[in-house]
A protein has these predicted regions:
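C-terminal peripheral helix-coil segments that are non-catalytic and often amphipathic
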Residues: 1-8, 140, 144-152, 169-177, ...
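Basic, helix-initiating cap at the start of DNA-binding domains
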Residues: 1-35, 40-51, 65-68
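Short hydrophobic/aromatic patch on the recognition helix
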Residues: 49-60
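Short, basic, alpha-helical segments at the C-terminal edge of helix-turn-helix-like DNA-binding modules
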Residues: 72-78
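Short secondary-structure transition hinges
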Residues: 102-144, 151
Length: 207
């Protein structure tokens, strides 16, 4: 009877467990971040999830489809976490500092620039647009916080979109690695403090 209720070809679901598609995406995110786009196969994802390769292909016809959804879901979660941090009653500077630390803890061991460059050559224009839209959501969360801070006279009047792009540009330095794969600063706390101080002193006009 249960077999008849689900669409033909759809993998069986255990109602008490996390949805299979969610499990696939979560494992794919980790594998892609750890190993890069090219080195991860659909078989790797299936084995990591404890499902068949056919199950992965049921939800995602191609690796590019899986990668796109994995990255979109990851950015949506980041946006939600950013919004949660920025919604606290603390100052913008304190909230941004906390957000930078959360970001760096999640990505400190990853060369994000090389990671995204490697993957983008394999994606269609539509898939790239999906990722760009998700990325824009992250920017919007920060931009809204910047706008509120300007209205509350917490930071000087200026273009909140410019402030936002400046913030993300400086934030990306946290993922910089030299030829020996070493970061500029040895600890996440020190990196976060340097990023925030540089950004804050810049928009506040301090020299």
């Amino acid at each position: 009877l249960e077999q008849m209720k689900r669409p033909l070809g759809r993998p069986p679901q255990d109602s008490k467990k996390k949805p299979t598609k969610t499990t696939i995406v979560e494992n794919a995110i980790q594998l892609f971040l750890q190993n890069g786009y090219q080195l991860v196969s659909m078989d790797d994802v299936a084995k990591n999830c404890g499902v068949t390769k056919a199950t992965v292909y049921y939800y995602y016809p191609t690796k590019a489809d899986l990668f796109t959804d994995a990255m979109v879901q990851m950015m949506l979660r980041i946006s939600e976490r950013m919004a949660e941090i920025l919604s606290s009653n603390k100052s913008l500077k304190v909230n941004l500092h906390e957000m930078v630390k959360v970001h760096l803890r999640a990505t400190f061991e990853i060369d994000l620039k090389a990671f995204t460059k490697e993957a983008k050559v394999s994606l269609s224009d539509e898939q790239l647009q999906q990722m760009n839209n998700a990325e824009e959501m992250m920017y919007n969360v920060i931009e809204k916080a910047m706008t509120t801070a300007i209205e509350n006279e917490e930071i000087p009047r200026g273009n909140s979109k410019f402030y936002t792009q400046l913030f993300f540009a400086i934030l990306s330095i946290g993922n910089y690695r030299d030829t020996d794969q070493k970061s500029i600063f040895s600890t996440i706390d020190e990196m976060a403090e340097q990023i925030i101080d540089f950004f804050w002193n810049g928009i506040m006009g301090k020299k």
